[in-house]
């Protein structure tokens, strides 16, 4: 960012006590990355690498591939119990390891390994929840916008954008109309943690565009909205389609659940019987 646009943003931030400089904005750059991926039911699922949370969805799918969801009621307590336990295991790893890889090693290969998936799947008890997992710290945000475009030549774009909280930081650069995000909330303040705040560092990021690939070609760019929910949403939609044969609309409309910080959040469409089954499992 340079010129009048950068000056407008820096002036606003400086007026609020920020130490931002024109050089900071001029040095801002995007980068090309190699997607990370796993295989689920014969399809490749591709995600953005850390600092994004896409790896969380892939860890979930690796766990669920060992459970055998296809024989379960897609709207039943057992299916959702397995999905939520896989999510809790995956988010626990996310909050311990996912960070800006340019500031330290993020063990992507280990997190996506068959060995780890086997170990995590073996921890799931079909009759009760795992007790010794960390509580998710993220608020559940609902203001993300996702879009996808495919042209006549099947070039595909999977795109997602968000200021994080509603109206981001609430700070507006008056001349340009730029509303600043508050993605710094994704950092932790624990010294020595891979995701501890530092100058020039990118925080753990929730927005994750994805693609399904078959025989080397993209067949479905996809994404969901909801902040921290997105990784669960990816795994849920893919499972709905590949385990249960739902079409895209059915997969999106199907009842959802999320292991929130205080309790399990479940969609209104989930039956009383399924809810009671989840309560019985803890």
Question: Which ranges hold each PLM region?
Answer:
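Internal maturation/activation junctions in enzymes
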Residues: 6, 66-163, 175-176, 183
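Glycine-rich phosphate/pyrophosphate-binding beta-alpha loops
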Residues: 46-54, 144-148, 158-171, 224-230
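Alpha-helical support elements that line or immediately flank enzyme active sites
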Residues: 2-14, 224-246
């Amino acid at each position: 960012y340079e010129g009048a646009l950068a000056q407008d943003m820096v002036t606003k931030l400086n007026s609020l006590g920020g130490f931002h400089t024109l050089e900071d904005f001029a040095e801002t750059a995007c980068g090309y990355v190699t997607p990370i991926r796993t295989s689920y039911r014969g399809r490749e699922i591709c995600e953005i690498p850390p600092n994004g949370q896409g790896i969380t969805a892939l860890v979930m799918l690796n766990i669920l591939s060992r459970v055998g969801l296809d024989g379960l009621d897609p709207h039943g307590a057992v299916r959702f119990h397995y999905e939520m336990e896989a999510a809790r295991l995956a988010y626990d790893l996310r909050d311990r390891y996912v960070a800006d890889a340019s500031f330290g090693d993020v063990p992507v290969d280990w997190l996506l390994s068959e060995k780890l998936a086997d170990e995590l799947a073996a921890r799931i008890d079909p009759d009760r929840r795992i007790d010794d997992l960390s509580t998710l710290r993220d608020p559940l945000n609902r203001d993300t916008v996702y879009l996808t475009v495919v042209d006549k030549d099947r070039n595909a774009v999977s795109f997602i954008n968000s200021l994080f909280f509603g109206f981001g930081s609430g700070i507006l650069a008056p001349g340009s109309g730029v509303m600043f995000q508050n993605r710094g909330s994704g950092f932790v303040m624990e010294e020595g943690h891979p995701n501890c705040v530092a100058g020039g560092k990118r925080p753990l990021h929730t927005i994750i565009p994805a693609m399904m690939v078959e025989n080397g070609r993209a067949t479905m760019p996809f994404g969901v909205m909801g902040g921290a929910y997105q990784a669960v949403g990816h795994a849920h939609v893919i499972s709905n389609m590949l385990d249960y044969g739902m079409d895209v609309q059915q997969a999106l409309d199907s009842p959802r659940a999320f292991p929130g910080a205080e309790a399990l959040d479940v969609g209104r469409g989930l039956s009383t019987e399924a809810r009671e089954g989840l309560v019985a499992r803890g």
